[in-house]
Every structure is written in C-alpha cells, then in structure tokens.
Amino acid sequence: MEINLTTKKLDNVKTDAVFFLMFEDNKKLEGELEKIDKALNGGVSDLIKLQKYKAEEGKFLIVPTLGKIKANYVAIVGLGKEKKFENDILRRVASYIIRKAKELKLSDIIIDTNLQQFENYDEVVQAITEGLILGDYSFDKYFSKKDEHKVKEVQVNIPKNQDKDRLNEFVRIGEILAEAQNFTRDLVNEPANVINTIQFAEIAEKLAKEYGFEIKIYDEEEIEKMGMGAYLAVAKGSDNPPRFIHLTYRPKNSQGEVAIVGKGLMFDSGGLNIKTGDFMRWMKSDKSGACAVFGIFKAIGELKPDITVHGIVAAAENMPSGKAYRPDDILKAKNGVTIEVGNTDAEGRLTLADALSYASELKPDAIIDMATLTGACVVALGEFTAGVMGNNQKFINEILKTSEETGEWMWQLPFNDKLREQIKAPHADVYNVGTTRYGGAITAGLFLEKFVDPKIPWVHIDIAGPSHHTSGWYYHPKGATGIPVRTITWYLLKRSKFFDKIGK
C-alpha cells in the first residue's frame, strides 16, 4: 500500500472513494464536501437526515455517487466530539477507513484532512499513516485460503498552505514506526514450533546484517561462564537451548546510551508449576518483550537516531522435564544476588534478573525493560494498559508522557517498602514470588530492582495486558499488538534530539 500526500480539489477527482473526516459537533457540510453534495443534488445531506447520522468516532456514512462525479463513493467518517479529540483518534479512524476500503473491495482512496480544527499537520499525517498501516495488518500466512484484496494507494489530501516536503518526512516516520510494530506482531504471532530460541537468535543475526548492528550471541556454555544462574535454571527444562542475544546500534555522533531489555520466553508452560490449559493458551506471546526489542531495532536501523542503543534478550523456553528447575531451588544471579524459587511459573523475572545485571554492567545512561511479566498487572489495569515502574521518577514521567503521544496506554504502579518485605526469602536474598497474592505486579518490579545498578535510571514496563488480545481493539487486530514499539522508539528519537534536524 502506497501512502501519498496530495492537494487536490475533490469534487471531480477519479478515485474509488473519498473519505471526509467530520466532528460530531459539525452541523453543516463545508468546503469540498459541500461542493460534492451539490454535485450529487443533495445526496449527502439527504442521507444524513434519512439515517440521522451523527459523526461519532468510527461511524461511517457511505454515499454511492452513481456516476454523477468521478469518485465511485463519497464517505464521511466520524471523529467524535471535538473536545475529546486527540491524535490517537486519527490513528483509530484511519484504521477503520482502511478496513472499510478492504470490505468494499476498493483499490485507491483519498482521505481529506482539510479541517480548521487541525493545527499540527506533522502529527496529523503521521497519525493517519500509522493508523492505515497498523489497521491493514493481518497474520494470515497459515490460512490455506486468504483474502487477496489489497488497497493499492491511499492519498492523504492536505491544505495547500502546508509544507509538503516536510510532511512527507512525517509520513516516512509513521511508515517506519508502524512497519516496525507490524514486524513485531509477526514475530509474536509465530508459534513456538516455528520460532524457538535458535531461530530467534537467527532473526537477530539477520537484523544485524541488514542494518549493520553489532551482535553477540552467547550459547549455554558461555552463559554459564558469565554466571547467569537464574536464566540457566529456567532454560534447562527445555530441549531447546538458551541463547543470550546482545544487539548494539552505535552511531558516529551518539548523544547518549540506552539499554533495552526484553523478556524472551519463546513459550511458557509454567514449568513444574504447570499452567492449566486456559492459562497456557497464547503463551507463544510470552516473547512479546523480546520481539519488541527487535521491532525497535528495525525502526532505529531505518531512522538512524544519534543515540547508542543496546538490545538485550535472554531467550529461553520454560518447560517441565526431569532437568527442570524446582520450587525451593536456590539460584545465584550474575550480580551475586541469591534467589529462592517459590514458583517455577514466575520464570520471566529470573531471565530478566541476569539480563538486567548484564545491562547494568554496560553502564548505559538508562535501562528500559519490557515484559509480559504478571497476570496481576492485567487484574490491576485491565487488558489495554501497561504498568510502569522504576527507580527514577523523572524517567518514569518521560516514558508516560511519550506513551500519551503514541496512544499506547500506560500507568504507573508505585513501589513501597511494605511490598519489598513480601519478597524476602527464608533461605536466600530474595523470593521470586511475593509471600501474599496481593500487589503481584509491583512485587515483580521490586524483584527486578535488585538486579539493576541503582545509579542507572531504570523503567520496567509490564505489558502482560496489552501485548496480545483475543479479539483486538482500535487499530489492533486479534493476536499480537506490537506494544510498546512506537513508544520506546519515539522516546529514543526525542532523547537523541532527532527532531532538531527537521525543526520540530
């Protein structure tokens, strides 16, 4: 699908459909839509009255033109109430438009953005671009019969007084971010019989070759030499060996250094504390954090910001066997902290313990980890919101602010000393589970805190809720969402002063 900017008059342009955006507050047709209504002898305004149409978010009014103008259809799509408008609504509405176009078997469409309420067209064209690409996504490679219809071109109509060259740069940024998120979705959606630890490391190697990243991949023997006892314990129950992956993007004019760590469980059965069938379903998505690392690297490989980025993944599988680790086992992490195992299904934090210790030894300016870590976070915040924790409030605030800009919902969960008491172990430095069933998302974050150098600002993002969805929402289809690829990439762009080059 091509996305192009244009400044056309729309009352006599040849296309399959012209989509006009409208706020619910609008009481009359204006501009190009008013001209088209006259050309259709009031066909649009008559249908609005007949259907009692209100431009609620995502609600369509489709008008066949019956050859009276060159466009086959004219459509209105609602933006909802103006006072509730935010840029993410444009992403959502763009995704609805692309799905409607596919439903109607349209090949080329125009989206008109000439609304006086729109002030920042950088944000308008980027949000629409992202929404189109994210909404167009489907994971259909394993279907024997597929819907082959594709929309070939979307033209986004902008006001003539806008700087088209500048806006094309934001279309490009939107394309890169959305394609990186879709790449992440593809990886998460692949089952464990297709992507295991070895194959995941091979994907990292392909990324490194394509974009010129530095890469180190450590095998089981090397992982043991590095003293990663917590990670190895989780991995040893599976016939698929662990692979520790370290990607590095290192530009010439680096403005700082950030390490990104992703939880990389190719599949999580729960181990000896085995999950029930309902809870084991979709556990291919327990690699979502690691896949997000790869998605972020794909984006920065294209955008080339002036900031050094480390991508770190401890890839493993948590399986029951005679070799599997057990409750009551005591493990030693890379940084020397000892861990008493309370439950083998709290394995992600064990792999992250060694990954965060490794990241801390790199002495970056900041560390971000992303993990489908706890069901407790889903209970606390629901399926659509990620939980954010960390050791530096300024850093947490920066991530939360960025998530508001990208439409990837996040909310802070507070650390406190009373919950720290709940991860004290009887016979080791720390328990891998809390001693009560309360505050589980936070106690997991507090566990991770013990493996991060306290001098390094660190944020933990629990994406257990929004990383994967059984029915989909907004521009996310059923399955993997690719969250939080756009948030973390956008944060890296801002931190590296990327937008100074284009005057944002």
Curated annotation (Swiss-Prot):
Necessary cofactors: Mn(2+)
One term under GO cellular component: cytoplasm
GO MF terms held by the record: manganese ion binding; metalloaminopeptidase activity
Catalytic activity: Release of an N-terminal amino acid, Xaa-|-Yaa-, in which Xaa is preferably Leu, but may be other amino acids including Pro although not Arg or Lys, and Yaa may be Pro. Amino acid amides and methyl esters are also readily hydrolyzed, but rates on arylamides are exceedingly low; Release of an N-terminal amino acid, preferentially leucine, but not glutamic or aspartic acids
Top enzyme category: hydrolase
UniProt remark on cofactor binding: Binds 2 manganese ions per subunit.
EC number of the protein: 3.4.11.1, 3.4.11.10
Pfam families: Peptidase_M17, Peptidase_M17_N
GO biological process: proteolysis
Sorted UniProt keywords: Aminopeptidase, Cytoplasm, Hydrolase, Manganese, Metal-binding, Protease
Sequence positions that bind Mn(2+) 2: K263, D268, D286, E347
HAMAP family per the UniProt record, alphabetical: Cytosol_peptidase_M17
Record function comment: Presumably involved in the processing and regular turnover of intracellular proteins. Catalyzes the removal of unsubstituted N-terminal amino acids from various peptides.
Family: Belongs to the peptidase M17 family.
PANTHER family found in the cross-reference section: CYTOSOL AMINOPEPTIDASE (PTHR11963:SF23), LEUCINE AMINOPEPTIDASE-RELATED (PTHR11963)
The name this protein goes by in its record: Probable cytosol aminopeptidase
Organism lineage string: Bacteria, Pseudomonadati, Aquificota, Aquificia, Aquificales
